[in-house]
Amino acid sequence: NKKNIDTLSIDGNSQFGAGYPLGDIPAYNKIPSASKDKTGLSIQKAANYIQKSIFFMGLTSGLSWLAWALDKPVVMVLGAVASDYHFSPSPYTIQNKSVCHDCWRKHNPKFEDWYWCPEDKNFECTREITPEMVIEKIDKLI
């Protein structure tokens, strides 16, 4: 990467989702190809990696809370969840407020359906977060 930062994926799985087809291709979310696959670790090992890191980047998840508890800056990508829901105020929260966002307070989430968008807008809340928005937050940290 351009910033010469090693990126590790420490999620539970290297891919997830229900595999619903998009066209003829099963759709799964996969870890970024440029990251080092450290998925499937115990919480303790994940905590060790976080503790040694400069910062943590993730979604609204238990690992983000763990990083926060370990006093690491958390670059958090938000879509359907409100920006005041986590570690507020945080200078490293990323949310595109020019599109649909913060809808999960208005609906009963269907956690069993990976492709359920509460506003039926195909998750524009996260799709419209640009690499530039992410890089801007990371630049504040390094």
PLM segments and residue spans:
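Donor-binding and catalytic core of enzymes assembling or modifying cell-surface/extracellular glycoconjugates
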Residues: 1-84
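Extended amphipathic secondary-structure runs
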Residues: 46, 52-53, 135-142
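Nucleotide-sugar donor-binding patch of glycosyltransferase catalytic domains
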Residues: 27-30, 68-141
